[in-house]
């Protein structure tokens, strides 16, 4: 993604002039903000934009976008986010067995999924309930390996307290077969496992509908 943004920026620099160049470059920053990609390459390109267009009317919006990008990329991983080593895991069960004897709320997501990110705004009550009732919050990302760093930063940026696993090749297809349909997986997808490691809800309620989700978690705990 970084190379794509850089190529686009320098293509605009060489191919366009004046207001057209200025607007095209500014859109790169605004699209990054709007789509929450937070491409780190844009941080250095911001300096280039300022040199080329120091009086640009786009500057307030570009500065805001760059500020959000920088905040994301400078996010530290807090102690309450855990990334267990699952490199040897062959199945989903190998992962859930790490939390034997506990109810598990699994959130299947990806960094590129807008609805997944939007749902994170509603996780407060779920986090409080999980802490009080020893429920494991397991965030299962279907991101590709090349997005590993972004995946970790995004988990921290959104304050996703809990366990974080990125799908491994060994059980990638199993995730799609188990929770998808005809080879496609719609995310976000929420799954609840009981204390015996059995799936109780293959399509649990979103944290946005907390009262209903709480009932499902309580049922899984019986």
Residue ranges and their predicted role:
Residues 73, 128-172, 180-181:
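Conserved segment of the thioredoxin-like fold in thiol-based oxidoreductases
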Residues 110-114, 144-146, 170, 207:
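Solvent-exposed loop/turn segments at secondary-structure junctions
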Residues 103-104, 188:
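Alpha/beta-hydrolase fold active-site loops
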Residues 160, 169-216:
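Thiol/disulfide oxidoreductase modules built on the thioredoxin-like
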Residues 1-95, 101:
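Oxidative protein folding and maturation machinery
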Residues 106, 138-140, 191:
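Conserved hydrophobic packing residues within short motifs/helices of P-loop NTPase cores
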Residues 100, 108-125, 142:
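Conserved redox-active cysteine motifs that mediate thiol-disulfide chemistry
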Residues 19-20, 99-100, 130-133, 157-158, ...:
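A structural signal for short secondary-structure junctions
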């Amino acid at each position: 993604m970084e190379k794509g943004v850089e190529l686009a920026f320098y293509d605009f620099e060489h191919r366009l002039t004046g207001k057209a160049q200025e607007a095209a470059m500014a859109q790169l920053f605004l699209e990054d903000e709007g789509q929450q990609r937070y491409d780190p390459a844009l941080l250095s390109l911001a300096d280039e934009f300022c040199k080329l267009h120091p009086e640009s009317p786009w500057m307030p919006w570009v500065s805001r976008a760059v500020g959000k990008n920088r905040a994301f990329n400078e996010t530290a991983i807090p102690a309450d986010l855990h990334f267990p080593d699952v490199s040897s895991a062959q199945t989903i069960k190998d992962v859930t067995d790490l939390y034997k004897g506990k109810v598990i709320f699994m959130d299947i997501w990806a960094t590129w999924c807008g609805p997944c990110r939007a749902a994170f705004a509603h996780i407060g009550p779920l986090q409080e309930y999980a802490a009080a009732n020893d429920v494991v919050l397991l965030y299962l990302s279907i991101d590709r390996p090349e997005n590993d760093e972004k995946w970790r930063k995004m988990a921290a940026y959104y304050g996703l307290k809990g366990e974080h696993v990125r799908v491994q090749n060994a059980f990638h297809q199993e995730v799609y077969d188990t929770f998808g349909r005809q080879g496609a997986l719609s995310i976000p997808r929420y799954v609840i496992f009981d204390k015996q490691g059995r799936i109780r809800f293959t399509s649990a309620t979103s944290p946005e509908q907390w009262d209903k989700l709480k009932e499902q978690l309580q049922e899984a705990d019986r």
